[in-house]
Design a protein with these regions (language model features):
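Conserved active-site-proximal phosphate/metal-binding subdomains
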Residues: 1-117
């Protein structure tokens, strides 16, 4: 859910970050630092591909994350993003996102029959 709201109209992150989420597709993320902690998922970029090839991420890679979030420098730090990245196809207002979540929930409940929530 976090990635969906980061890519909303109201999110304060730079438009470059939002656009990268939209453009990434289902294979647009990498799981980094698999053999250490913290394990993170981030959008593919030259930086994250390099980190993935090394197999381990030095936490100094996160030092410039403000430049990524607010200046739009997509190579400044790993752009944290969840598995839902590939399901996000447009930047929407939060109100619309929540309405769609509720509609989808209600649709699934109807398919489940008499289960009441």
């Amino acid at each position: 859910m976090g990635t969906r709201f980061v890519s909303s109209v109201e999110s304060p992150v730079h438009r470059n970050f939002k656009d990268k989420i939209i453009d990434s597709g289902i294979d647009g993320t990498l799981i980094l630092n698999k053999s250490s902690k913290p394990v993170i998922r981030a959008l593919k970029s030259d930086l994250t591909i390099n980190i993935d090839q090394k197999g381990e991420m030095d936490m100094s890679a996160m030092m410039n994350i403000q430049n990524l979030y607010f200046d739009g420098d997509m190579e400044a730090a790993p752009a944290l993003s969840g598995q839902s990245t590939g399901l996000i196809s447009e930047i929407k207002p939060v109100k619309k996102i929540i309405e769609e979540i509720i509609d989808e929930f209600n649709s699934v409940c109807k398919k489940m029959g008499n289960i009441k929530f």
